[in-house]
Curated annotation (Swiss-Prot):
GO biological process: translation
Provenance organism: Pyrococcus furiosus (strain ATCC 43587 / DSM 3638 / JCM 8422 / Vc1)
Coiled coil ranges: none
GO CC annotation: cytosolic large ribosomal subunit
Subunit structure: Part of the 50S ribosomal subunit.
Signal peptide region: none
GO MF terms held by the record: structural constituent of ribosome
Protein name: Large ribosomal subunit protein eL32
Length: 130
């Protein structure tokens, strides 16, 4: 796949994501335990209007909402995210298609070393704050 097609697929994914609704579980607004964690759960009740996909009821996830397969799971910049804990893990990355995300357990001193080495290797760091 060439670079032009890859960029086009990233734009298509961004457009699809803008239109995609938040898929929340049935009656998430009704119970406090669902409000705090309103992740998707498939409606299974025999009288469930949402399961029957009736008009006016919240949407359900289906295959049509997915993004193009070649760019699925990538960072919005187009890089594959790789979690890095030290400089050795950083050196195993491919700068053309992978970007580093420094783990939250890494301290300030080691974080500075990783950022410095990433600049030398030409690797993009997604969270470079010091």
């Amino acid at each position: 796949m060439d670079e032009k097609e890859f960029k086009r697929l990233l734009r298509v994914r961004a457009r699809l994501k803008r239109k995609k609704p938040r898929f929340l579980r049935q009656e998430w607004w009704r119970y406090p335990k669902f409000k705090n964690d309103p992740k998707w759960r498939r409606p299974k009740g025999i009288d469930s209007k949402m399961r029957l996909k009736l008009k006016g009821k919240p949407r359900s996830p289906s295959i049509g909402w997915s993004s193009p397969k070649l760019v699925r799971g990538l960072h919005p910049s187009g890089y594959e995210e790789v979690l890095v804990h030290n400089v050795k893990e950083l050196e195993a990355l491919d700068p053309k298609r992978q970007a580093a995300r420094i783990a939250h357990t890494v301290g300030k001193k080691k974080r500075i070393e990783i950022i410095k080495r990433a600049e030398e290797l030409g690797i993009k760091v997604l969270n470079p704050r010091v």
